[in-house]
Amino acid sequence: MANAGVNETVAVAVAIDAPGVGHDHGAAGEVRRPSTRRLAPAGSGGRLMAELLGVFNGLTERMGEDVATSSSSRLLFRALKLALPALRDGGGDGGGGQSVSRALVVAASLADLQMDAEVISAGMVRGALDTGALAMADVEAQLGASAAGLVEESLKVKRAPSEVDVADEEAASALRKRCLSSYDIRAVILELAVKLDAMKHLDVLPKHQQRTTSLEVLKVFALLAHAVGAGELSLELEDLSFQRLYPQAYAHIDQWLSSQEDDCKRVIAASKEELLRALTADDELRCTVTGVDVMGRYKSRFSTMKKLVKDGRRPEDVNDILGMRVILDPRPGGGGGGDGDGGDRACLRTHEVIKAMWKDVPARTKDYITRPKGNGYRSLHVAVDMSEPGPEGKKRPLMEIQVRTREMDMAAVGGQASHALYKGGLTDPEEAKRLKAIMLAAAEVAAQHLRDEPAGDGGQTTAAASAATAGNVERAFQLLDKNGDGRISMEELTEIMEDLGAGGHDAEELMRLLDANSDGSLSSDEFALFQKRVKLKTKLENKDDEYKEILKQKLQKVDDTGLIHVYRKNLSDKLVLV
C-alpha cells in the first residue's frame, strides 16, 4: 500500500548497456539534477534501438494510462525517430549527445506536467529546430500540422520578451497578459519547460545575455508558470534567476539554509518514516485509500529571500524550512476521486493522524480543500512543532505538511491548464475563457512580489525620464564618434580602448559583442543597446548589494536557541556568478 518517495522531476536518461529511465533518488529536499550518462554512439544499430525504446518506455510511463493512448504513442514514437538522429548529428552546444540529453529532459518535464503527446512531441523536436538540425516542414510532415503549430507558437512565446523592455513592470505585465490570452496555453507550457532547461545551461552564453535571460525568466516566465498553476516549476525558475541576478544575496540565503540542512534532513527522513508507518497502520484510512506517498519538500531560496527582505520577517519567523507532502490515492467508488468526498475524507483523516503524532499549530492550518484558492488549488496545509521537548531540547522551525490526493497534486504541480487537458477539457470555449481569466489574475497577484525589482528606467515611467536617458546615450555616442559620421568605426573603438589602457584585441572582441548586424561598426542603436546592458548590470549589482546587506544583518545574528547557525566563511571567491 505504501510508497515513500521524493517529489522531484527525474530526467530521462539512457544507459549504454540497457534501455530505461535513470532515476536520481537523493535525500529529501534536494533538487534532482539530470543524469549525464553518455548515449549510444551513432554507429551501433542495436544500441540505437535500445536507446529509442528506452526513452519511449520512460516517457509513456510518465504520461500515465489515461494519456498514453495508442494514437499518442504512435505520435511520440514518430517524434523520437525524428528528433534523436537530428539532434545527435546536428550537435549543438556541447555536441550531439548533450543535445539529445537536453531534449529528453524537456520531454520528461512535459510528461511530468501531464501534457499530452502533441506537446511532448513538440518539446522533443524544439531543440533540433533551435539548432537548425530540423526544419519546420520536417516537423509538420512527420508529426502533423497541430504539433508543428505548437512548436511555432512556442517560438513566438520565446521571442516575445525581446520585443519589450521586461525590466519595465507595465511592459512585462502587458506581455504576460498577451502570452496567456493570445497563445495556446500548451505552447506557453512547452516554452516554460524549454526555458527551465535553458536556465540550467546559461554558462554557454555571454554574461550580458545570462543577465538578460535571467531577468526575462524572473519577470515573465516564472510568473507565467505560477499563472498556469505549475508552482514547483515557477519556484525553480525563480531560484535559478535569483542565483544569476543577485549572486551575493543568493549566497547568503544558501549558506544559511545549508547550515541547517543536515539537521533538517535528519528530521525529515525520520518524520517521513514515522508518518508513513502511522498512516498505513490506520484502519480508517486504509478503508478509503489504496496508497500513500510521503515525501520531503524542496525549500525555495528565492521565496526565503522574499520573506526575509520584502516581508521583513526575522529568520526565526521563517517557519517552512522543514516540509513534507502526503499524497493519497482514494479508492475507486469511495465517494469520488481527488475532488470527491472520499478523497476529501482521506485528507481530513490524515490530518487527524498527524495531530495525534505531533503538536500542531492551529493558527497556521490552511484548509484549501474545503475552501479552494481562486486558481482552483486544493490542499490541506498543517504546521507542527518539531522541537525537542523540555527546556534543554533543541528548538526547530515549524514543519509544514501538505496533504492532498493524487488528482489534487497533479493539478497543483502541473497546473490547472494541464489538469484540464488531462480531464479532456479546454475544448469548451467558455471553460478555456474561464481558465485564462484565472491565469491572468494569478499572474498579476504573483507580480506584486516583484514590484521593486530593477526597472528599465530606474523606476521612472515619465516621458521626461525617458527623454533624459535617450539624451545621455546620444551625448556619449557623439563623444565616441570622433568623425561625426553617425557610426563608431573599428579605428575609433580601438583608439578609445587604447586610451583606456586596453589593446586592439580587446577592441575587436568588444566590436564582435556589440555589432549586431556584423557590418564592422557600431550604430547609435547598437550603442544604445550596449548602454542599456550597462545600466541594467549596474542596477542589478546595486540591488544585490542592498539585499546582501539586509541578509547579512539578519542572518549573522546567532540565536541562543541554536535555531540559527551561520558559517562565517569568506565567500568572495564564490560570488562572481553573473
Swiss-Prot record:
GO CC term (a single one): chloroplast
Pfam entry (one): RelA_SpoT
EC number: 2.7.6.5
Transit pept. (range): 1-45
UniProt KW keywords: ATP-binding, Calcium, Chloroplast, GTP-binding, Kinase, Metal-binding, Nucleotide-binding, Plastid, Repeat, Stress response, Transferase, Transit peptide
Alphabetized InterPro entries for the sequence: EF-hand-dom_pair (IPR011992), EF_Hand_1_Ca_BS (IPR018247), EF_hand_dom (IPR002048), HD_domain (IPR006674), NT_sf (IPR043519), RelA_SpoT (IPR007685)
Annotated domain remarks: The calcium-binding sites of the 2 EF-hand domains are required for enzyme activity.
Function: Possesses calcium-dependent ppGpp (guanosine 3'-diphosphate 5'-diphosphate) synthetase activity in vitro and is able to functionally complement E.coli relA mutants. May be involved in a rapid plant ppGpp-mediated response to pathogens and other stresses.
Membership in a protein family: Belongs to the RelA/SpoT family.
Protein name: GTP diphosphokinase CRSH3, chloroplastic
Organism: Oryza sativa subsp. japonica
